[in-house]
């Protein structure tokens, strides 16, 4: 079986065992690191949304929506984007939406904010890639695409020429503005996001989710 160990700068430790029969077993008492684990699982093609949802129920001891219910809610909240998004992005968003709608009562709510911001990052990378703009960490990060040192982020002249579409360009800049604002407030500025400010208020966490979903849907309506 696969044996994965995670640790964080906050002292959290967690072990995930993935057995040959498909069973996932979590060991440890993590805090924010669970959010990274949920995101990691969403990227794994052999781990289903049903498995992720079940692990959420086990870990947080809450009743969450089924995958079909979460997907229906997601489709209702991003009607313009739902059918246009890469399925991996939907797989990241769906469990986070389900958890946000549960009766979750924890000390800290990064468990579903982290995945939705990673989904927004994934969308931005996809949109850049469609215009032939690549970001290759660790030498490059998203900031390398934009003019440095500006209060509002503007694509570099080279990348503006590649995009050659003012509406598309504005969408890229708006996404990065929001993403960087949240990243600097919530996360470390590296390509792999790490929390530096925890989220202790559920309403604040839910507001971030609503913001991200609105940005995604508005972007889809304009350029996807």
What would you call each of these model-derived segments?
Residues 127-173:
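Flexible secondary-structure boundary motifs
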């Amino acid at each position: 079986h696969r044996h994965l160990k995670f640790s964080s700068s906050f002292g959290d430790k967690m072990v995930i065992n993935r057995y040959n029969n498909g069973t996932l077993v979590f060991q440890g008492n993590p805090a924010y690191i669970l959010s990274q684990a949920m995101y990691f699982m969403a990227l794994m093609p052999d781990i289903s949304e049903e498995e992720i949802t079940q692990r959420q129920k086990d870990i947080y001891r809450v009743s969450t929506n089924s995958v079909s219910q979460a997907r229906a809610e997601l489709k209702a909240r991003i009607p313009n984007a739902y059918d246009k998004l890469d399925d991996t992005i939907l797989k990241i968003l769906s469990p986070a939406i389900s958890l946000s709608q549960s009766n979750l009562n924890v000390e800290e709510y990064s468990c579903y904010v982290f995945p939705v911001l990673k989904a927004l990052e994934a969308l931005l990378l996809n949109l850049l890639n469609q215009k032939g703009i690549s970001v290759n960490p660790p030498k490059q990060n998203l900031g390398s695409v934009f003019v440095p040192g500006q209060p509002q982020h503007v694509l570099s002249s080279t990348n503006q020429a590649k995009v050659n579409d003012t509406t598309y360009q504005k969408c890229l800049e708006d996404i990065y503005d929001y993403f960087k604002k949240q990243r600097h407030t919530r996360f470390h500025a590296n390509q792999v996001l790490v929390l530096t400010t925890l989220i202790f208020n559920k309403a604040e966490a839910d507001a971030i989710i609503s913001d991200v979903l609105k940005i995604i849907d508005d972007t889809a309506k304009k350029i996807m």
